[in-house]
Amino acid sequence: MSTSFDHSVILSPLDHIAPQAYVSYLLSFQTANSTHCLSLLEAGITRLTKVLPLLLGHIVVNPELDGKYNIQSVQIPCTKEDRTILVHKHHPFPMESALGGVQSGMSMLETSDSKQHLCPLPPLIPSTERQPVIRFQANIFTDAIVLAMTFSHIVFDGTGAAKILALLGRCCRDPSVTPLPLIIDEQDRAQSAIFAGLADTSPAQDHTAELGPAPAIHPVPLDAASLRTCRFEFNSERILQLKYQCSQVLKNACMFQPNSASIPVADLPPFLSSNDVLTSALADAIQRVKSQSKTYDCLDLCMAVNMRGRIELSAAREFLGNMACNLRLKTPGPEYTGPEQCLSCRKTHDCPIQTDQLRFLTDLACKVRNKVRNMDRKYFQSCMTYIANQKDWSQTGMIFTDLAFSSWRHLDIYGLDFGDSFGIVHNFDLSFGLIEGDVIFLPKRLTCDQKEAGWDVHITLPAKDLEALVKDDLIRWLMGRDGE
């Protein structure tokens, strides 16, 4: 985000491939001292914008810049006008009345606009209208405050947005501390270090599978056939049990039969993570629901991979802009030819998964792990060079597949500190999804009676597919509801 003399911040190559949409984070605080909290928020946001004036800006498109077309930048106002980025709204009822949804079976199916009234901006703004960088809305309930932060995805990614919330918490909890450094200068130096040396070189790899013409995101229709977003809560012990079974298959590579394995034994990864295994299980279950069959011809998924810790640059770790590259995995569907034999997991619960299905999930998890392992600094430089070499930067974006995974589980949202008046973050939520097949792993929340945090996951699908998904045997088992 290098700042020029005319208060313009040029967005990076990675910013340009992000979805042209707005994302809303909603933080809930249970407090009866809402008036004092609101005044702290107002003072905190004022302080934050002084060290990060980028937040006051709006996005514009430069028709031509340095021989490239349609490069986007942020225009920062140099006057005191148009500096209000916080609005507040009073609701004369308890918080749960506004955050409730429609019960369907065993999960909460949220109507696609059920939380939008809590957000300061819609998810899509026409290109003919002004495009702000970020806005905040303080929703004052009789028993709580819900702080909504809506940000442009082409300026920040999920991790960068969480860092902004952490900075805001610091500004709110103690306005009298030593003044913060001018963060925009730090971001300027970080971007220079991260994206330096991309011009006049050739990409080392082919990126046409994961990057292509920028896909259009259309508003979600609000009829009976529209998309819905459902929040699933998966049991951590069940995920660990499934991970154990997949790891056993991986360890005993001979379980991969020649006619069913697609990864040579020599190329198997050294380990599988819980993220790999849950991604594979959800991808398989959703694809089965969509195809209405136990088997399907092909599975095509993409995943946003946070590159901050993968490119060996300290400047990247605190960078607020987009730092996610797009992983693309297209693989044949399962072939269940073996006996209908179920494998038992450890402890007392039987996992409703057959031998061939376990092999397929392990194979899929191995492919995901191998793809992630290969996304290093060399890959990052190649990807950035590919984007930078495009003549028209508006024509390249992340290719969305049937299933699009993102993980924000690493975000320390529940550890944010806004001060004693606010207390702890009671709940974190998102506005509804815009893309069919969107799967987001939410920040982990560890309660006092859990050794391992459960997995909260947002899934966006047509309502009929979500209804079928919550009835799937493997999904029910992963949620710990197989006995109901």
From Swiss-Prot:
One of the protein's GO biological processes: indole alkaloid biosynthetic process
Under the heading InterPro entries, the entry gives: CAT-like_dom_sf, Plant_Fungal_Acyltransferase, Tri101-like_N
User: Which is one GO molecular function term here?
Assistant: acyltransferase activity, transferring groups other than amino-acyl groups
Q: Which reaction does it catalyse?
A: fumigaclavine B + acetyl-CoA = fumigaclavine A + CoA
Q: What is its EC number?
A: 2.3.1.205
Give the top-level enzyme category: transferase
Q: Describe its assembly.
A: Monomer.
Q: Which family does it belong to?
A: Belongs to the fumigaclavine B O-acetyltransferase family.
Quote the protein name from its UniProt record: Fumigaclavine B O-acetyltransferase ifgI
Origin organism of this chain?
A: Penicillium roqueforti (strain FM164)
